[in-house]
Every structure is written in C-alpha cells, then in structure tokens.
C-alpha cells in the first residue's frame, strides 16, 4: 500500500446523497478478487450507456475532472452492501481521498484498509467545497494527513480528525498484512518454539 502523507489533486464534485456501493461498482463487475482493474467500472451505470458509450454529462467524463484524485461527496457515501471492491474501484481509478459529511461505517473502514483517506467535514464545509469545485474547473485541494488539514491555494483551511492508529497506517503505507509483517521475526521465533 502506498503511504499517504500529503496529496494535492483535482476535486471531482459528485453532488448526490446516499451513493451506495452498487453505484460505486455495480455487482456484475465483482467476479474477480484481485484489487486492480476495477477503475474502468467505477460509477459504471452513471458514466456509460447500456451500449457502453460515455455519458458526457457525468462529472468524471468531463475533461476538467477526468484526472481527479479527490472525490467530494454528500451524506452517507458508500452505503448499501459491504463490498471491498468499492474502495478498490475508487483507488484503481486514481482517487486517494474522499471528502463527505458522513460515510457508511463498513465503507469508511474499508477505505483506510486500502489506502484511501475518507475525510468527514461538516455539511457547511462540504457545501463551500462544492461551491468552489463546481465554479472553478480543475479546482485543487491539498490534503495534509500529517497536519490533518485540507487546504486550497486561496486560503481555505479545514482541519479534520482521524483515528491515530489509522493515521499511522496511512502515513506508513501499512495495511493489515503490512502490520503483521512488522512482527515477522517474532512470528517465526514463536513458530520455531512450537
């Protein structure tokens, strides 16, 4: 997993509430267990027609937002069924951070385990970010996990909270396996004594 320390990226404003995991990555694309290759199916039913043609009006199909790495969302992002494929699709597309007023718990936890930083900000703060992102194509935010702050180049600055353990894992690029491997010598010593 790649460390997340400071990230600057274009913000894609997805102005929909209750975006569920089936919208993030539809069920027909869940037939694989490897983590890569899902980005092409992200928001598939919103991005493409039934014939596979791009829907030009969808935010990620517009030129200003195709290279976005910060997703701005509304309340209850990631609700619905538990599927780790949802953060896999976001990450594979290129997103490193999702900002919203609230997240579904399982999705929120899965983001951390897969190298995506989910940030909870107030509805007022998210509204202000939507105003800026929608009025300024290529609007960028810098997310500083070390300092726990979201900034733009116009002076906006919003602090955010992250659990210290999750922060440590993201800063160091550690998933569950990476944490376990830190104790590989102790595990080997234990196994040798058995």
UniProtKB/Swiss-Prot annotation:
Q: Where is the signal peptide?
A: none
Q: Which GO terms describe its molecular function?
A: 3-isopropylmalate dehydratase activity
Tell me if Transmembrane helix is a UniProt keyword of this record. no
The record, for Pfam families, names: Aconitase_C
Q: Does the keyword Disulfide bond apply?
A: no
> Do you know which Gene3D superfamilies this protein is assigned to?
Aconitase, domain 4
EC number in record? 4.2.1.33
Among the entry's GO cellular component annotations, what is one?
Answer: 3-isopropylmalate dehydratase complex
- Catalysed reactions listed for this entry: (2R,3S)-3-isopropylmalate = (2S)-2-isopropylmalate
Q: What does this protein do?
A: Catalyzes the isomerization between 2-isopropylmalate and 3-isopropylmalate, via the formation of 2-isopropylmaleate.
Q: Mind telling me which NCBIfam families this protein's record contains?
A: leuD (TIGR00171), PRK01641.1 (NF002458)
Record-given protein name:
3-isopropylmalate dehydratase small subunit
Q: Which source organism?
A: Brevibacillus brevis (strain 47 / JCM 6285 / NBRC 100599)
| Designated gene of the protein | leuD
